[in-house]
A protein has these predicted regions:
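A bilobed periplasmic-binding-protein/Venus flytrap-type ligand-binding module shared by bacterial periplasmic
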Residues: 156-163, 199-204, 277-292, 297-299, ...
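Early extracytoplasmic/lumenal segment of secretory-pathway proteins
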Residues: 50-117
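Extracytoplasmic ligand-binding site segments that recognize negatively charged/polar headgroups
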Residues: 61-68, 104-242
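N-terminal twin-arginine translocation
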Residues: 20-27, 36-50
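N-terminal secretory signal peptides
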Residues: 1-23, 27, 34
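C-terminal capping/gating helix-and-loop segments adjacent to ligand/active sites or protein-protein/ligand interfaces
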Residues: 307-368
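Periplasmic-binding protein-like
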Residues: 66-67, 153, 180-193, 215-223, 262-287, 300-323
Length: 368
């Protein structure tokens, strides 16, 4: 029994190495022959094993738990396939590295929609199969060739109610007005959301943001540089706020919900002019589960999954059919709720996919 299991595992690993180009055909044939198994049977067995489950590449923590309960259970009930996780974080460079190596181990990456714009045309992603996935179950412009928005998260801001009393900041112009609203601000150091906020503070309408006027945005950001701190993770900005290091902070709206609770309402979330960011699913080229991943993506679009992700993670549904079913207690925090949807601004993934690298570099130089 031990010998059979060893041969099975050895052949499965050899099949993966052969398909990834790390083993030549002659060596692979020799191993199969020595084991008394036909090459095609080994490859078929490897594919069958991969098709038993889908591997989601995300950021771990609560995200793993919530995606498992909100989507994984329904996906398994519908298809009989399981859901596993790689929680190492699908950074764009890591996706490129995985695909270029030929050793693709993930089926779907929890990413931003602009990653579909930058990675798809370079051959690093599979196209979305819209005969399975629905373009109608996301917002217009957010169903792209190589990625589809599943949820939305918003760049909003929180402020200290004790600092501003009965005259609180209400929009981005107030956030950038350090004379009327003195105090230290916290901005996202990777530029996204901060650039758009600066332009709206400088008088640009939300509908006229793109293409971003980088000089104008950076000048506005530099105007409050002496009153600003910069954060790179949700836990970092959360700590800044709850420890009263800042009076206001640009923040993801789901983190804002947590901060309101953790500070007993001392800090309040403002979703007016929140920048709606399309969180997306993208599929690395050559994903091991093949077409089965499209059923997983379609399951994530269904209303129960959308509402479950909102309840568990605070991520807002991108399926318009779910907007009217957002529970009353989630209305203040969900950016596509009836309370907020007319006040938000939409991110342009095409602009960020083509210009994001240069924009981030210019932003980092401006705040250094």
């Amino acid at each position: 029994m031990h010998d059979k299991q060893f041969k099975k595992e050895m052949l499965a690993e050899s099949a993966q190495a052969f398909k990834a180009g790390r083993m030549d055909r002659r060596t692979f044939l020799a191993l199969c022959g020595a084991s008394g198994v036909a090459m095609n049977a080994v490859l078929a067995g490897d594919a069958e094993a991969a098709a038993d489950h889908v591997v989601m590449w995300n950021w771990g923590g609560q995200s793993e738990e919530c995606h498992g309960s909100a989507i994984g259970e329904a996906f398994t009930a519908k298809t009989g396939k399981g859901l596993k996780f790689d929680t190492s974080g699908p950074l764009e460079g890591k996706i490129k590295e995985m695909v270029d190596s030929g050793n693709v181990t993930a089926d779907v990456a929890d990413a931003d929609l602009f990653n579909a714009v930058s990675l798809g045309p370079t051959g690093h992603l599979e196209p979305i199969d819209y005969s399975v996935v629905s373009k109608e179950k996301t917002l217009p412009g957010y169903a792209l060739e190589y990625g589809v928005s599943i949820i939305l998260y918003g760049y909003a801001f929180v402020y200290d109610t004790e600092a501003y009393g009965d005259n609180p900041p209400q929009n981005w112009a107030d956030f950038f007005d350090t004379e009327k609203f003195p105090g230290t601000r916290a901005l996202y150091k990777w530029a996204n959301g901060s650039l758009e906020a600066a332009l709206m503070a400088d008088g640009v309408a939300g509908s006229d943001l793109y293409p971003l006027d980088m000089d104008r945005a950076l000048n506005k950001i530099q105007s409050i540089k002496d009153d600003s701190l910069y954060w790179g993770s949700g836990s970092e900005v959360h700590s800044m706020v709850v420890n009263n290091e800042v009076s206001m902070a640009i923040i993801w709206q789901n983190r804002g919900r947590n901060i309101e609770n953790d500070t007993d309402g001392q800090y309040k979330l403002v979703n007016n002019q929140a920048m709606a960011m399309p969180g997306a699913y993208i599929v690395p080229k050559g994903n091991p589960a093949g077409a089965a991943v499209m059923d997983f993506i379609a399951t994530a679009q269904d209303i129960p999954a959308q509402l479950a992700l909102l309840d568990c993670l605070g991520m807002t549904p991108s399926n318009p059919e779910a907007f009217g079913q957002i529970p009353e207690d989630q209305q203040p925090y969900a950016i596509t709720s009836a309370m907020n949807i007319d006040k938000i601004v939409y991110n342009d993934p095409e602009w960020w996919g083509k210009n994001g690298g240069d924009a981030v570099n210019a932003f980092l130089e401006a705040i250094s």
